Amino acid sequence: MAAIKIANPGAEVTRSQAALAVNICAARGLQDVLRPTLGPKGALKMLVSGAGDIKLTKDGNVLLHEMQIQHPTASIIAKVAAAQDHVTGDGTTSNVLIIGELLKQADLYISEGLHPRIITEGFDVAKTKALEVLDEIKVQKEMKREILLDVARTSLQTKVHAELADILTEAVVDSVLAIRRPGVPIDLFMVEIVEMRHKSETDTQLIRGLVLDHGARHPRMRKQVRDAYILTCNVSLEYEKTEVSSGFFYKTVEEKEKLVKAERKFIEDRVQKIIDLKQKVCAESNKGFVVINQKGIDPVSLEMLAKHNIVALRRAKRRNLERLTLACGGLAVNSFEGLSEECLGHAGLVFEYALGEEKFTFIEDCVNPLSVTLLVKGPNKHTLIQIKDALRDGLRAVKNAIEDGCVVPGAGAVEVAIAEALVNYKHRVQGRVRLGIQAFADALLIIPKVLAQNSGYDLQETLIKIQTKHAESKELLGIDLNTGEPMAAAEAGIWDNYCVKKHLLHSCTVIATNILLVDEIMRAGMSSLRD
């Protein structure tokens, strides 16, 4: 009897081989769900929520977040894969597939009597060697636009169809290059992704400026301003209650009127400072003037600004204030004391676009903007969500390539090369540990196998072709998914991120090792006691 049964007779216990079988079964089950989604030719999954909302996706990270996974082992694997996406932005599906395959290959040896500890030691040796091989085959490149286009296209084609991927590729690369500054880490939050349910997904475009999801609040304000000064501020232009508990008291009507006039004058003085600055900078030109405020602007203030041809937007999102100053220049001011021309940014064109009841304000033609906007268009909600998920992965792929300073060939070439290196290396290792190395090598081949299978080719035949040609030529060969034949991935411009592959090898080995060493599963928490 298990020791926990003595302390808690109601506990559920699974031991030894049964525990291992349960864990491997859970990992294989999760692998089977994600297996058909790998690669550019992968299948889509339709997710239907409890409320009836539909989401079509083949993004592993989205699937793992949206699915309700109850099995504890499958849940652990899902969290590890989701962490992979959080750290590197890609490799979620590959993570689940390799973990499942590592456990499957280990199970073959364990069923013949090999102890799990021996297998895990082999996995650790194999991981160390695999990382050495990965460092040898990585390609150091100057990250020019052409290479980044290939990296982005490789990532995006696994998320959306090829025609759309080609359109998104240029937008993604140009947006990262726009916000890139020498010696400063790339901040992808400076790329705003804005949805517009309009036209088709192929109309998605890069705006070298900002798109705000609201418009001006006064009918007399101009809908289009060219060559405009931009004042970004966080100053209230309406009467607000005090932040502390306080009040003003009056005894007569005259005193009340004085209070009202004083409150009004307080706001009007602030508005007048904006008007004075506008008249100063635009006195001898036809330049426009736009005020974008995080706080409110009351109707009287809007009327004053409209009379002087000033376009004013209120209640702008806080995150857009930083983006505005980076895109247009100038400073975000919290007070109108000492307001000067140095505080102003500039945009070549500011215009309002109405789409049904929604309004959008475009701020374009900025000089060297350090913040840009990806305007996602599509006919329906699930298309917009799918494109947004793809764009995030594409942006991360380009960022990773720039920060790594190197790339690795894709299309399964890395896995084939590492697997062959491990098979050759195992003969230099003494004892049964070499069986763990062989299991690791076989598990990595799940990636080229599934890529071939999802493209409609025989997985074993395709793999043998690649391995044979790789052994002869020593080139890094992947699978041409259009023909099923071996191809030089580097020549075809198919590049993966080095950091994704490195993180993948680390995380897969660690989680597979931990699962193999579980010999008892106990469900004896407070919730099961109450049950």
UniProtKB/Swiss-Prot annotation:
<dbReference type="InterPro" id="IPR027409">
    <property type="entry name" value="GroEL-like_apical_dom_sf"/>
</dbReference>
<dbReference type="InterPro" id="IPR053374">
    <property type="entry name" value="TCP-1_chaperonin"/>
</dbReference>
<dbReference type="InterPro" id="IPR002423">
    <property type="entry name" value="Cpn60/GroEL/TCP-1"/>
</dbReference>
<dbReference type="InterPro" id="IPR012722">
    <property type="entry name" value="Chap_CCT_zeta"/>
</dbReference>
<comment type="subunit">
    <text>Component of the chaperonin-containing T-complex (TRiC), a heterooligomeric complex of about 850 to 900 kDa that forms two stacked rings, 12 to 16 nm in diameter.</text>
</comment>
<dbReference type="Pfam" id="PF00118">
    <property type="entry name" value="Cpn60_TCP1"/>
</dbReference>
<protein>
    <recommendedName>
        <fullName>T-complex protein 1 subunit zeta-2</fullName>
    </recommendedName>
</protein>
<dbReference type="InterPro" id="IPR002194">
    <property type="entry name" value="Chaperonin_TCP-1_CS"/>
</dbReference>
<keyword id="KW-0143">Chaperone</keyword>
<dbReference type="GO" id="GO:0005524">
    <property type="term" value="F:ATP binding"/>
</dbReference>
<dbReference type="GO" id="GO:0016887">
    <property type="term" value="F:ATP hydrolysis activity"/>
</dbReference>
<dbReference type="GO" id="GO:0051082">
    <property type="term" value="F:unfolded protein binding"/>
</dbReference>
<comment type="similarity">
    <text>Belongs to the TCP-1 chaperonin family.</text>
</comment>
<dbReference type="InterPro" id="IPR027413">
    <property type="entry name" value="GROEL-like_equatorial_sf"/>
</dbReference>
<keyword id="KW-0547">Nucleotide-binding</keyword>
<keyword id="KW-0963">Cytoplasm</keyword>
<keyword id="KW-0067">ATP-binding</keyword>
<dbReference type="GO" id="GO:0005832">
    <property type="term" value="C:chaperonin-containing T-complex"/>
</dbReference>
<dbReference type="GO" id="GO:0140662">
    <property type="term" value="F:ATP-dependent protein folding chaperone"/>
</dbReference>
<dbReference type="InterPro" id="IPR027410">
    <property type="entry name" value="TCP-1-like_intermed_sf"/>
</dbReference>
<comment type="function">
    <text>Component of the chaperonin-containing T-complex (TRiC), a molecular chaperone complex that assists the folding of proteins upon ATP hydrolysis.</text>
</comment>
<dbReference type="InterPro" id="IPR017998">
    <property type="entry name" value="Chaperone_TCP-1"/>
</dbReference>
